[in-house]
Amino acid sequence: MTKFTTFFTENNIEIKNKKFLLAASGGPDSVALLKMLVNFLPNPSEQLIVAHLDHCLRDDSFLESQLLQRLTSALKVKLVEKKWPVELHPQAGVEAKAREYRYAFLAKVGRKYQTDYLLTAHHGDDLIENILLKFIRSGDVAEMNSLQIVGNLGSMKLLRPLVKYSKDELLKYDKDHHLDFIEDKTNFEDDTLRNRLRHHVVPLLKKETSHLVKNANHFSESVALLSKCQSDLFDSLPSPINFSKALRGKKEDIARLNTHEAAAFFDYLIYKKWHQRIHFDEIDLNKNVIFNKENFQLLFYQKYYYLINRNELAVIDPKRKLVKLNEKFSFNGKKYLITQDEKSQKLAGYFYGEKAKYLEVGSLPQGSTLKLATGKQTKAKKKFAENGIPLALRPYCLTVWQEENPVYVESVYQNQEYNPNFIRYNVYIYF
């Protein structure tokens, strides 16, 4: 049994009546994978689709298209092609944008032809380079496991069946099977860190051991296991909720974590919600302090923790606005509706007040007071503190006024004055 067939059995990949989408470039790796799939699948003409995106980044990129047309025609498999329009090329960050456009193209092809699997030709040398790149750039172990052999892209499973093959093995496979391919000439330049690692560092490491690809796979599998153990631990903790412009959780829910585990927990939450890698240092849960890291702020207030992405904080408009009952309105990036009726949407709160067609809404100014049931006034900041809402989030709590009096403050206050003629207003939030 070859490494190729072993990949499918070890990962329980079903073959019968399944459709495969191969991302091909015309290079030696994807050409080898194409040939392996044609030899492996029971009915490649019906089961296999080859997708090729011409990035139009080189004058000779059309040669790859010509090669794939000849090859797929000879092998009797379908080829789907598209060009990345030059006018969409960015001035900077071309590689990231190209990848984004490529995977959007592949996802679209997958949906159109209802393919079950997407296969890419990443191999063991790519894995080694990825590990070294992440080690140099961040040292984050989780990032070193970015090239997983089985993943997901939309409704398709993403498969990388060549990760246990070295580049040399694939070149030998191409030679043995008399396969033509095109080498991207930019791969031979030293202008990128990946290329410099490929040309100068990886060959030295291979001289030290003949098991470098095997060891890289073992490292990747170990990291995947450790990452799963960590995510299982963090997912077993009570999940924070979306609160105003933050994630909010109870400090007691994570009290058993030590300072390093707490830092990793908040790194995990940020990546899970915002897909951004952030690395907090030690986090002491017993101190009511604020931690700032890049565009994120972590703060502890009263019995809660709050995780805020400052990029999502809208500019506060100090002006109140008039809204009509039963009509949706926007406040600080969220949609609300005030009505006397019951709705299926999430109820943000309710209050009692005089019957009216219009209400004033806005952000409660600092220094405001709120009327108690006794008729006395209390400082609004006291009510915010009682409800564990920190200063940074208070302007984002929706306030409703009637006759210049606040009658509702989201998550904080509702009119306490009793009047038999008052009616109930429900405040709904739309996500």
Swiss-Prot record:
Its EC number is 6.3.4.19. Pfam families: ATP_bind_3 (PF01171). It comes from the Bacteria. Keywords: ATP-binding, Cytoplasm, Ligase, Nucleotide-binding, tRNA processing. One of its GO terms (cellular component) is cytoplasm. It is found in: Cytoplasm. ATP binds at residues 25-30. GO terms for biological process: tRNA modification. It catalyses: cytidine(34) in tRNA(Ile2) + L-lysine + ATP = lysidine(34) in tRNA(Ile2) + AMP + diphosphate + H(+). Its main location: cytoplasm. One of its GO terms (molecular function) is tRNA(Ile)-lysidine synthase activity. Gene3D superfamilies: HUPs. It is an enzyme of class 6 (ligase). The N-terminal region contains the highly conserved SGGXDS motif, predicted to be a P-loop motif involved in ATP binding. Ligates lysine onto the cytidine present at position 34 of the AUA codon-specific tRNA(Ile) that contains the anticodon CAU, in an ATP-dependent manner. Cytidine is converted to lysidine, thus changing the amino acid specificity of the tRNA from methionine to isoleucine. Belongs to the tRNA(Ile)-lysidine synthase family. This is tRNA(Ile)-lysidine synthase. It comes from Lactobacillus johnsonii (strain CNCM I-12250 / La1 / NCC 533). The gene is tilS.
